[in-house]
């Protein structure tokens, strides 16, 4: 199954989940508007590619876990775009959810996409112990101790001059935890040993850092057409960013160094057990920026 086919099945898994009789058709319309807005689906693809790299054939349960992750990510984008947060009118090249459906419905759509994923994982045909651990890890990655906590720190840091350590703490939680989840989840699904699981978590944290450095660079250098959203929002909000603290060229060097570290750890995993990570490597390499 190629990546385009995987993306189609990820999307279909979410659509199927909401195809049963809903309490509010308007709510489902708002949810699916954002779910079907496109995007690279990097988080769920990383999870699926990892499962395959360890030699496990993909099953419906794996797509349910991957789709649950994408649902939470999409919910976070809906809330990020709200006037009380980033106040953005466009996401992925079209109107943000609150501009299309109103703020109240957008909030509810985001709420649903934060809560429903746990139900999707719960009904997956997986061992109960694995499902409990997946739900626990996703809760830690998405909630108070992960993405939401990082967003709170990010808001508190607006207009303040943060140092590099403070910035890394914010993004390790705001962006990093949810990007580390595919690696942790794959380890749980494949049931690797503790040593490999620790390496997978470390790789995920590095990818999370790389993703944020990349996002900060693009906010400075990319156009609306390239981003699909308003550029230079961080500058307007007076946020500390990697280019602001390190300079643009040093930020680019940091991005490459972090991605190199992640690739080296993948090679270490491949030395000690069957592991075919070519597709995974391509996804990671796609995060590099070239002049």
Model-predicted regions and their roles:
Residues 1-291:
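All-alpha prenyltransferase/terpene-synthase fold signal
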